[in-house]
């Protein structure tokens, strides 16, 4: 697991209070991990802070799964 992936997963576990084993690449923040829209916004803000990136709102709307978050951040950090 990449450093980015492990940091993303740690943020999700911390913010959503879910078990680390539930945070798999294909897990949806809302459908699988129980996040509501406010939780999702807070996750995006935490990703921005942790990785020192900006995620525009139109892009944030496309980040619905753990894997999508990891991919977006890996691309943004290149």
Curated annotation (Swiss-Prot):
Domain Carrier: 2-77
Post-translational modification: 4'-phosphopantetheine is transferred from CoA to a specific serine of apo-ACP by AcpS. This modification is essential for activity because fatty acids are bound in thioester linkage to the sulfhydryl of the prosthetic group.
Pathway membership, UniProt: Lipid metabolism; fatty acid biosynthesis
UniProt GO molecular function: acyl binding; acyl carrier activity
Residues carrying O-(pantetheine 4'-phosphoryl)serine: 37
Gene3D superfamilies on file: ACP-like
GO cellular component, one term: membrane
Main location: cytoplasm
Family: Belongs to the acyl carrier protein (ACP) family.
Name of the protein: Acyl carrier protein
């Amino acid at each position: 697991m990449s450093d980015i992936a492990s940091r993303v997963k740690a943020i999700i576990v911390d913010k959503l209070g879910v078990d680390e084993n539930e945070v798999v690449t294909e897990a949806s923040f809302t459908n699988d991990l129980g996040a509501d829209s406010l939780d999702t916004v807070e996750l995006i803000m935490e990703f921005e802070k942790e990785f020192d990136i900006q995620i525009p709102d139109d892009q944030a709307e496309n980040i619905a799964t753990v894997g999508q978050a990891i991919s977006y951040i890996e691309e943004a950090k290149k």
